[in-house]
Amino acid sequence: NPKYALSCIKAAYDQGARWVILCDTNGGTLPHEVTQIVGEVTKVVPGKNLGIHAHNDTGNAVANSLAAVLSGVRQIQGTINGLGERCGNANLMSLIPTFFLKKDFSSKFEIGIKSKNIKNLTDCSRLLDEILNRKPNQHLPYVGAAAFSHKGGLHVSAVQKDPKTYEHINPEEVGNTRNIVVSDQSGKSNIISRLKSIKIDIQENDPKIKKLL
Protein backbone atom coordinates (compact mmCIF):
# COMPACT_ATOMS: atom_id res chain seq x y z
CA ASN A 1 0.00 0.00 0.00
CA PRO A 2 2.20 2.87 -1.25
CA LYS A 3 -0.18 5.57 -0.02
CA TYR A 4 -0.18 4.21 3.53
CA ALA A 5 3.60 3.70 3.48
CA LEU A 6 4.18 7.29 2.38
CA SER A 7 1.84 8.60 5.07
CA CYS A 8 3.82 6.70 7.73
CA ILE A 9 7.11 8.01 6.36
CA LYS A 10 5.84 11.59 6.34
CA ALA A 11 4.46 11.27 9.87
CA ALA A 12 7.81 10.01 11.17
CA TYR A 13 9.71 12.81 9.47
CA ASP A 14 7.25 15.50 10.57
CA GLN A 15 7.59 14.34 14.17
CA GLY A 16 11.35 14.73 14.12
CA ALA A 17 12.84 11.52 12.75
CA ARG A 18 16.38 12.34 11.65
CA TRP A 19 16.58 9.48 9.16
CA VAL A 20 13.97 7.50 7.28
CA ILE A 21 15.48 4.23 6.07
CA LEU A 22 13.95 2.44 3.09
CA CYS A 23 14.39 -1.30 3.63
CA ASP A 24 14.30 -3.89 0.88
CA THR A 25 13.65 -6.53 3.52
CA ASN A 26 13.06 -9.52 1.24
CA GLY A 27 15.73 -8.46 -1.25
CA GLY A 28 13.42 -8.71 -4.23
CA THR A 29 13.39 -5.10 -5.40
CA LEU A 30 15.27 -4.28 -8.61
CA PRO A 31 17.30 -1.13 -9.35
CA HIS A 32 14.71 0.49 -11.63
CA GLU A 33 12.10 -0.06 -8.93
CA VAL A 34 14.35 1.54 -6.32
CA THR A 35 14.68 4.58 -8.57
CA GLN A 36 10.89 4.85 -8.85
CA ILE A 37 10.30 4.36 -5.12
CA VAL A 38 12.90 6.89 -4.03
CA GLY A 39 11.46 9.35 -6.54
CA GLU A 40 8.08 9.09 -4.83
CA VAL A 41 9.47 9.20 -1.29
CA THR A 42 11.53 12.33 -1.94
CA LYS A 43 8.26 14.14 -2.63
CA VAL A 44 7.44 13.89 1.09
CA VAL A 45 10.89 13.57 2.74
CA PRO A 46 14.11 15.31 1.61
CA GLY A 47 16.75 12.99 0.21
CA LYS A 48 19.26 14.24 2.79
CA ASN A 49 17.14 12.47 5.42
CA LEU A 50 16.70 9.20 3.53
CA GLY A 51 18.67 5.98 3.76
CA ILE A 52 18.67 2.62 1.97
CA HIS A 53 19.02 -0.86 3.50
CA ALA A 54 19.33 -3.43 0.72
CA HIS A 55 19.42 -7.23 0.85
CA ASN A 56 21.10 -9.30 -1.84
CA ASP A 57 18.49 -11.96 -2.64
CA THR A 58 18.53 -11.06 -6.34
CA GLY A 59 22.23 -10.15 -6.38
CA ASN A 60 21.29 -6.47 -6.64
CA ALA A 61 22.04 -5.08 -3.17
CA VAL A 62 24.97 -2.96 -4.36
CA ALA A 63 23.17 -1.91 -7.55
CA ASN A 64 20.07 -0.97 -5.55
CA SER A 65 22.15 1.09 -3.14
CA LEU A 66 23.82 2.95 -6.01
CA ALA A 67 20.45 3.55 -7.68
CA ALA A 68 19.12 4.96 -4.41
CA VAL A 69 22.03 7.37 -4.09
CA LEU A 70 21.65 8.59 -7.66
CA SER A 71 17.96 9.16 -6.91
CA GLY A 72 18.62 11.28 -3.83
CA VAL A 73 19.26 9.01 -0.83
CA ARG A 74 22.18 10.05 1.38
CA GLN A 75 22.68 7.22 3.88
CA ILE A 76 23.69 3.75 2.72
CA GLN A 77 23.69 0.77 5.03
CA GLY A 78 25.80 -2.28 4.34
CA THR A 79 28.19 -4.81 5.82
CA ILE A 80 31.80 -5.84 5.34
CA ASN A 81 31.97 -8.54 2.65
CA GLY A 82 28.18 -8.33 2.30
CA LEU A 83 27.60 -10.60 5.29
CA GLY A 84 23.99 -10.81 6.39
CA GLU A 85 20.86 -12.86 6.62
CA ARG A 86 20.00 -15.25 3.78
CA CYS A 87 21.98 -13.97 0.77
CA GLY A 88 23.55 -11.08 2.65
CA ASN A 89 23.41 -7.29 2.58
CA ALA A 90 24.94 -4.60 0.40
CA ASN A 91 28.70 -5.12 0.39
CA LEU A 92 30.59 -2.12 1.78
CA MET A 93 33.77 -3.49 0.19
CA SER A 94 32.15 -2.76 -3.18
CA LEU A 95 30.22 0.38 -2.28
CA ILE A 96 33.03 2.33 -0.59
CA PRO A 97 35.57 2.10 -3.43
CA THR A 98 32.86 2.74 -6.01
CA PHE A 99 31.85 5.96 -4.25
CA PHE A 100 35.49 6.98 -3.85
CA LEU A 101 37.01 5.93 -7.18
CA LYS A 102 34.21 6.30 -9.73
CA LYS A 103 33.77 9.87 -11.00
CA ASP A 104 29.97 9.62 -11.24
CA PHE A 105 29.99 9.55 -7.44
CA SER A 106 33.30 11.05 -6.29
CA SER A 107 32.72 14.22 -8.33
CA LYS A 108 29.26 14.78 -6.84
CA PHE A 109 29.45 13.65 -3.24
CA GLU A 110 31.60 14.23 -0.17
CA ILE A 111 32.71 10.72 0.68
CA GLY A 112 34.60 11.52 3.88
CA ILE A 113 37.22 8.82 3.40
CA LYS A 114 40.94 9.44 2.88
CA SER A 115 42.75 7.70 0.04
CA LYS A 116 45.22 6.13 2.48
CA ASN A 117 42.30 4.42 4.20
CA ILE A 118 40.86 3.12 0.93
CA LYS A 119 44.10 1.16 0.59
CA ASN A 120 43.16 -0.79 3.73
CA LEU A 121 39.98 -2.26 2.23
CA THR A 122 41.50 -5.55 1.10
CA ASP A 123 43.16 -6.12 4.48
CA CYS A 124 39.90 -5.23 6.22
CA SER A 125 37.95 -7.73 4.14
CA ARG A 126 40.39 -10.55 4.76
CA LEU A 127 40.80 -9.75 8.45
CA LEU A 128 37.07 -10.19 9.04
CA ASP A 129 37.09 -13.56 7.30
CA GLU A 130 40.07 -14.59 9.43
CA ILE A 131 38.30 -13.53 12.64
CA LEU A 132 35.19 -15.45 11.62
CA ASN A 133 37.25 -18.46 10.51
CA ARG A 134 35.48 -18.13 7.19
CA LYS A 135 36.85 -19.03 3.77
CA PRO A 136 37.31 -15.78 1.81
CA ASN A 137 35.33 -15.30 -1.38
CA GLN A 138 38.12 -14.96 -3.94
CA HIS A 139 35.76 -13.42 -6.47
CA LEU A 140 34.62 -10.41 -4.45
CA PRO A 141 34.86 -7.22 -6.53
CA TYR A 142 37.80 -4.96 -5.67
CA VAL A 143 39.14 -6.97 -2.70
CA GLY A 144 38.93 -10.64 -3.74
CA ALA A 145 42.11 -12.59 -4.45
CA ALA A 146 40.88 -13.20 -8.01
CA ALA A 147 39.65 -9.65 -8.64
CA PHE A 148 42.84 -8.78 -10.51
CA SER A 149 43.99 -12.26 -11.53
CA HIS A 150 44.77 -13.00 -15.17
CA LYS A 151 45.12 -16.46 -16.67
CA GLY A 152 44.70 -16.30 -20.45
CA GLY A 153 47.85 -15.55 -22.41
CA LEU A 154 46.25 -12.78 -24.46
CA HIS A 155 44.84 -11.19 -21.31
CA VAL A 156 48.22 -11.15 -19.60
CA SER A 157 49.97 -9.72 -22.64
CA ALA A 158 47.35 -6.97 -22.92
CA VAL A 159 47.47 -6.11 -19.20
CA GLN A 160 51.23 -5.73 -19.36
CA LYS A 161 50.90 -3.30 -22.26
CA ASP A 162 47.91 -1.39 -20.86
CA PRO A 163 46.38 -2.51 -17.53
CA LYS A 164 43.12 -0.70 -18.29
CA THR A 165 42.26 -3.27 -20.95
CA TYR A 166 41.34 -5.76 -18.22
CA GLU A 167 41.50 -3.77 -14.95
CA HIS A 168 39.02 -0.99 -14.22
CA ILE A 169 41.24 0.43 -11.44
CA ASN A 170 44.79 0.03 -10.21
CA PRO A 171 44.53 -2.84 -7.68
CA GLU A 172 46.90 -1.03 -5.32
CA GLU A 173 44.28 1.69 -4.83
CA VAL A 174 42.29 -0.72 -2.66
CA GLY A 175 45.29 -2.58 -1.25
CA ASN A 176 44.97 -5.51 -3.64
CA THR A 177 47.56 -6.90 -6.05
CA ARG A 178 47.67 -8.15 -9.61
CA ASN A 179 48.10 -11.90 -9.90
CA ILE A 180 49.35 -13.61 -13.03
CA VAL A 181 48.25 -17.24 -13.06
CA VAL A 182 50.11 -20.03 -14.85
CA SER A 183 47.88 -22.77 -16.25
CA ASP A 184 47.17 -24.74 -19.41
CA GLN A 185 45.72 -21.50 -20.82
CA SER A 186 48.94 -19.60 -20.26
CA GLY A 187 51.08 -17.98 -22.88
CA LYS A 188 54.65 -16.73 -22.92
CA SER A 189 53.67 -13.56 -21.06
CA ASN A 190 52.37 -15.56 -18.08
CA ILE A 191 55.57 -17.55 -17.73
CA ILE A 192 57.86 -14.55 -17.99
CA SER A 193 55.78 -12.53 -15.55
CA ARG A 194 55.75 -15.29 -12.94
CA LEU A 195 59.47 -15.89 -13.26
CA LYS A 196 60.20 -12.19 -12.84
CA SER A 197 57.94 -12.08 -9.77
CA ILE A 198 60.27 -14.58 -8.08
CA LYS A 199 63.37 -12.67 -9.22
CA ILE A 200 64.30 -14.95 -12.11
CA ASP A 201 65.34 -12.84 -15.09
CA ILE A 202 64.82 -14.56 -18.43
CA GLN A 203 64.77 -13.43 -22.04
CA GLU A 204 61.57 -13.68 -24.06
CA ASN A 205 63.24 -15.83 -26.72
CA ASP A 206 64.75 -18.28 -24.23
CA PRO A 207 64.00 -21.84 -25.55
CA LYS A 208 63.24 -22.97 -21.99
CA ILE A 209 60.00 -21.00 -22.13
CA LYS A 210 58.74 -23.06 -25.06
CA LYS A 211 59.42 -26.23 -23.08
CA LEU A 212 57.34 -24.91 -20.20
CA LEU A 213 54.46 -24.16 -22.56
Please annotate each region the language model reported.
Residues 24-27, 55-57, 80-82, 207:
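Short, ordered loop/turn segments at secondary-structure junctions
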